[in-house]
Amino acid sequence: GPFALDKEYPNWDDEGEYTPIFKTIPQIDHVSVWDFYPDADATNMEQAQYIIQRHKMSRTELRALKRRPYFRESLIEDAIEQGENYTKKYWEDDLIDYNTENEIDRFEVLEYWGMIDVEFLEDQAIEIPKELKKYDELQVNVWCCNGKLLRVVLNPFKPARIPYMASPYELNPYSFF
């Protein structure tokens, strides 16, 4: 989906001192079909109650999440202390020719977009806006790794929606893909 990203542009002043310029720019990315898990009962994104995206991250990439909004620094460090937890799936050997990553240990980080009980949000000390208190479920974005909830936030999009688009090669009225 589209997100804002702060990008650093190299810049030097008249004295030769490095003074980078930071601009917020839109970012869009693709997700491999192997890392995208939509609602199993949905046949398209409009019907999906949730999606899960799997991220394979290095220790450095996981630590970089601490600089992004609403990520819980101490829980990220706890997840790192537990060690890399990614295990290669059976079908990934078939994709080895397309592998752009080095064969080093990784963390499996799961990103969830979808509905969740308000009770759970209150247990996580998430402040529920007054106008949303009447609902039993709300749309959220949750990141987890090694059993740690790295990020739990209400869906920031207005209206709340899952920020993914899926384009199947052929439409099948009985299946997502």
Language-model features: locations:
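Extended alpha-helical, oligomerization-prone segments that build pores/tubes and scaffolds
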Residues: 1-177
